[in-house]
A protein has these predicted regions:
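Thiol-/selenol-based redox modules, centered on thioredoxin-like
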Residues: 156-196
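Structural motif
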Residues: 80-83, 114-117, 135-137
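Short, internal strand/loop/helix patches
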Residues: 112, 123-158, 163
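Hydrophobic membrane-insertion alpha-helices, especially the h-region
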Residues: 7-28
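N-terminal "domain-start" segment that seeds a small globular fold
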Residues: 22, 30-69, 90
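Short active-site neighborhood of thiol/selenol oxidoreductases, capturing the structured segment around
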Residues: 67-96
């Protein structure tokens, strides 16, 4: 009886060590990759965002934004709109709530509004830490065009874009995706990312 019990233990221990190897070999042979779940659309290939040199911050029109590092060293949540009406205001509120929920990771993320709207005083009062880029119009348009995708134009799409700390556009969240889902993706991204 002791021999049978010992044999069962040896067989069981062997299976514990061999089973993962067999599973991995089968996954490799049949090119099977378990699906991952993210709510946003991964941008393939990644697009390098080049920020025009003459952009001015809406906070202080006499002072230009430091564009050399605008989308570097931090993750950027970018929202692009023609005019900031109800949908825009709701999305900006959602982005602020997402940002605040990051707790210790707040300094790693910045929010940027790219807009052609000149009347941004109300937005600036509501969201003083939001970076608002709205002039000169030619440079704002050049910047917004870089976010265009083959299936839509960035201006008017009401999408949220994620730019990594190396200025690469990497994810797009359509206007149909809820803020909770965006937050889940970003929390996971910040958890596993060393950048920013």
């Amino acid at each position: 009886m002791i021999i049978k019990k010992n044999q069962i233990i040896v067989i069981f221990m062997t299976l514990i060590f061999i089973a993962p190897l067999v599973i991995v070999m089968l996954m490799y042979r049949y090119d099977w990759h378990p699906g991952s779940h993210s709510y946003g659309e991964l941008v393939k290939p990644i697009i390098k965002i080049n920020v025009p040199n003459n952009l001015e911050s809406a906070k202080d029109s006499s002072k230009k934004v430091e564009v050399s590092g605008l989308m570097k060293d931090k993750w950027s949540l970018v929202y692009i709109t023609n005019e900031c009406k109800t949908i825009c205001e709701n999305r900006l509120y959602d982005l602020r709530q997402i940002h605040v929920s990051f707790d210790k990771d707040i300094p790693r993320v910045q929010r940027i509004l790219i807009t052609l709207d000149k009347n941004i005083n109300k937005i600036h009062e509501k969201y003083p830490d939001l970076i608002i880029l709205n002039k000169p119009l030619e440079d704002v348009s050049k910047l917004a065009l870089q976010f265009d995708r083959p299936s839509y134009k960035a201006i008017g799409s009401e999408n949220v874009y994620v730019v990594d700390p190396m200025s690469n556009l990497m994810m797009v969240y359509s206007n149909k995706i809820k803020s909770q889902e965006i937050r889940k993706d970003l929390v996971r991204l910040l958890k596993y990312s060393w950048a920013g």
